[in-house]
């Protein structure tokens, strides 16, 4: 029987994919040491057990627009996260997106997946990969992923889109098309919730140039889910992130000093407020601090779409929100500079 160290050694000749480590680890009650979190991060020790957090659930079909705006604004100020139901994206579009993503990870040969892998050492985020950024002490998340942009057309590079399954492109383009209307409504509500005109926040964010970056997270079964994390605690760099998970529990939010599981609602859209909306709002809306746990027996997957500025776009507090009594809390800077500072853990 292989030891955890043996598993690591087996994979030293290539980039170690978590999916491969998981299949080698199946018969063991341990995992390689680089996946074992420090005690103050381990889910078993830090999760408030027996309580599932009911984050605000908002009906996007509510005929009372003022009520809906208030609910979205309040959730964004107090929680930084909410779930949308009756959002207008058909269940079939979500099912198709999830079906082709699952097929890519579970049925496409590994050699074919590696054809669209990120180049090691490249600054390009798109492609199939494993670790997104260097963590302190060399720790790793129990997750493989695929990144590619789905909108606008000028930003899309099909080199990073899987050719198999054959319906992958159609399913992702349809989901991206359906999502744009939802994005417009969220931005309008966030804008009105700050006392601005409905169009002002999305215009400050870049309007039609906002980039939709899709990520598929694949968290295989983990022999020690009590010790590992799928994704370490963080806030998103995006304006907002819109996510659909599969049915396996995993998303946790930090609130009132505790980590809580977030209740799964089938086909709801989970919306995270990201760093850039916190900046645009001058701190009125809060970027949500969250992480992902893993499961011993089941594969968890999620499909976040990060709504981001183009790299050269400057983001800062919206001037209309500023006054002597409310000076800017954030610097205005190009998004690429913000990303560089955050990934390298430099002050903003």
UniProtKB/Swiss-Prot annotation:
Catalyzes the formation of flavonols from dihydroflavonols. It can act on dihydrokaempferol to produce kaempferol, on dihydroquercetin to produce quercitin and on dihydromyricetin to produce myricetin. GO terms for biological process: coumarin biosynthetic process; response to molecule of fungal origin. GO terms for molecular function: flavanone 3-dioxygenase activity; flavonol synthase activity; L-ascorbic acid binding; metal ion binding. It is found in: Cytoplasm. Its main location: cytoplasm. It comes from the Eukaryota. Signal peptide: none annotated. Its EC number is 1.14.11.9, 1.14.20.6. Belongs to the iron/ascorbate-dependent oxidoreductase family. This is Flavonol synthase/flavanone 3-hydroxylase. It catalyses: a (2R,3R)-dihydroflavonol + 2-oxoglutarate + O2 = a flavonol + succinate + CO2 + H2O; a (2S)-flavan-4-one + 2-oxoglutarate + O2 = a (2R,3R)-dihydroflavonol + succinate + CO2. Pathway: Secondary metabolite biosynthesis; flavonoid biosynthesis. Keywords: Cytoplasm, Dioxygenase, Flavonoid biosynthesis, Iron, Metal-binding, Oxidoreductase, Vitamin C. Binds 1 ascorbate molecule per subunit. The keyword Zinc does not apply. The keyword Ribonucleoprotein does not apply. Fe cation binds at residues 234, 236, 290. PROSITE patterns: FE2OG_OXY. Residues 209-309 form the Fe2OG dioxygenase domain. It holds the Pfam family 2OG-FeII_Oxy. GO terms for cellular component: cytoplasm. SUPFAM superfamilies: Clavaminate synthase-like. Its cofactor is L-ascorbate; Fe cation.
């Amino acid at each position: 029987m292989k030891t955890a160290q043996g598993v690591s050694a087996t994979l030293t000749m290539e980039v170690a994919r978590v999916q491969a480590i998981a299949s080698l680890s199946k018969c063991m009650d341990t995992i390689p040491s680089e996946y074992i979190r420090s005690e103050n991060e381990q889910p078993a020790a830090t999760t408030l057990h027996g309580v599932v957090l009911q984050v605000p659930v908002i009906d996007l079909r509510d005929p009372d627009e003022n009520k809906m705006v208030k609910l979205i604004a309040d959730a964004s100020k107090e929680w930084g996260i909410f779930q949308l139901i009756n959002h207008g994206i058909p269940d079939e579009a979500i099912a198709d997106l999830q079906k082709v993503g699952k097929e890519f990870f579970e049925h496409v040969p590994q050699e074919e997946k590696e054809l669209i892998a990120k180049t090691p050492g490249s600054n390009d985020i798109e492609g199939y990969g494993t670790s997104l950024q260097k963590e302190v002490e060399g720790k790793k998340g129990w997750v493989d992923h695929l990144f590619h942009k789905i909108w606008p057309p000028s930003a899309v590079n099909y080199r990073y889109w899987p050719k198999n399954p054959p319906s992958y492109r159609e399913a992702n383009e349809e989901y991206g098309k359906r999502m744009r209307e939802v994005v417009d409504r969220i931005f309008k509500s966030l804008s009105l919730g700050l006392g601005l005109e409905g169009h002002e926040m999305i215009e400050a964010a870049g309007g039609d140039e906002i980039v939709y970056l899709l990520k598929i997270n694949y968290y295989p079964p983990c022999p020690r889910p009590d010790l590992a994390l799928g994704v370490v605690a963080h806030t998103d760099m995006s304006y907002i992130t819109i996510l659909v998970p599969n049915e396996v529990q995993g998303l946790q939010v930090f609130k009132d000093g505790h980590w809580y599981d977030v209740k799964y609602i089938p086909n709801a859209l989970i919306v995270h407020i990201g760093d850039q909306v916190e900046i645009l709002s001058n701190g009125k809306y809060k970027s949500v601090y969250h992480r992902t746990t893993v499961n011993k027996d089941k594969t968890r997957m999620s499909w976040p779409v990060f709504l981001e500025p183009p790299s050269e776009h400057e983001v800062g507090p919206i001037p209309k929100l500023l006054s002597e009594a409310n000076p800017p809390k954030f610097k205005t800077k190009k998004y690429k500079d913000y990303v560089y500072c955050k990934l390298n853990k430099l002050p903003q």
